[in-house]
Curated annotation (Swiss-Prot):
Residues 242-279 are cytoplasmic. Its main location: host cell. InterPro entries: HHSV-8_K1_cytoplasmic_dom, K1_C. Promotes host cell survival pathways and may contribute to pathogenesis by preventing infected cells from undergoing apoptosis. Acts in host B-cells by mimicking the activated B-cell receptor complex. The cytoplasmic tail of K1 can induce the phosphorylation of a number of different kinases, leading to the activation of survival signaling pathways. GO terms for biological process: symbiont-mediated perturbation of host apoptosis. The gene is K1. This is Protein K1. Keywords: Host membrane, Host-virus interaction, Membrane, Modulation of host cell apoptosis by virus, Signal, Transmembrane, Transmembrane helix. It comes from the Viruses. It comes from Human herpesvirus 8 type P (isolate GK18). The keyword tRNA-binding does not apply.
Length: 279
């Protein structure tokens, strides 16, 4: 029974068992000889531990880490104990980047994606490459879109200084029928961008189903724990009642015990001493 309780608690509080659990690496495209800021995806302002090839960086406790062409496989651990891997791949300009905490292999249908073309050139073009075709989607360093069937595929950028395209960032989505939204983006090389269009709430059937199963699983465990606690309370009540009954009997005097005995004897023999009518 103890093992059953431990297993039930492990299901309910699975976060307790996720210490130092490795997640899939977040691939972060970086520009050679250019500082790159890594952000730990733990979403917490509490102290964070950073590691370089499993060697802890003792002086770094913030949620961000700025590096400059350092050959390391970085990882971070938040207060929850979950471990995230952040791998940087360095490229020569131009380099198409996205938030390191939101790599292309983790973006799901309906999420916003921000692309940034890191280059010293000013004649920047961001390309969408569906089915091998080159489609211009932005002529600024920033491009903001929502991942859906119409926007999935690979993206790259160019800087006008050479014919070479940047690295490719590819996104895959299997969405329900969702109408793409139009973004109006204002870009500045110093202030970044602002999005004026607001996105409607998007519901993905897969995510809804997953949430339903998650709630159903925890509800089943909760009901099982309630039934287990009720059973244990019933057993405990029976033990307490028996103990009290025994204690009360032990406090009775000998005459009282004899009186109870003869009263019980008369009750048991009363039905057998009644006269019988013969017809």
């Amino acid at each position: 029974m103890f093992l059953y309780v431990v297993c039930s608690l492990a299901v309910c509080f699975r976060g307790l068992l996720s210490l130092s659990l490795q997640s899939s690496p977040n691939l972060c495209p970086g520009v050679i000889s250019t500082p790159y800021t890594l952000t730990c995806p733990s979403n917490t302002s509490l102290p964070t531990s950073w590691y370089c090839n499993d060697t802890r960086l003792l002086r770094v406790t913030q949620g961000t880490l700025t590096v400059d062409t350092l050959i390391c496989n970085f990882s971070c651990v938040g207060q929850s104990g979950h471990r995230y891997s952040l791998w940087i791949t360095w490229y020569a300009q131009p380099v198409l980047q996205t938030f390191c905490g939101q790599p292309s292999n983790t973006v799901t249908c309906g999420q916003h994606v921000t692309l940034y073309c890191s280059t010293s050139g000013n004649n920047v073009t961001v390309w969408h490459l569906p089915n091998g075709q080159n489609e211009t989607v932005s002529q600024t360093k920033y491009y903001n879109f929502t991942l859906m069937n119409q926007t999935e595929g690979c993206y790259a950028c160019s800087n006008g200084l050479s014919s070479r395209l940047s690295n490719r960032l590819c996104f895959s989505a299997r969405c329900a029928n969702i109408t793409p939204e139009t973004h109006t983006v204002s870009v500045s090389s110093t202030t970044g961008f602002r999005t004026f269009a607001t996105a409607p709430t998007l519901f993905v059937m897969k995510e809804v189903k997953s949430t339903y199963l998650y709630i159903q699983e925890h509800l089943l465990v909760f009901m099982t724990l309630v039934a287990l606690i009720g059973t244990m309370c019933g057993i405990l009540g029976t033990i307490i009642f028996a103990h009290c009954q025994k204690q009360r009997d032990s406090n009775k005097t000998v005459p009282q015990q004899l009186q109870d005995y003869y009263s019980l004897h008369d009750l048991c023999t009363e039905d057998y001493t009644q006269p019988v009518d013969w017809y």
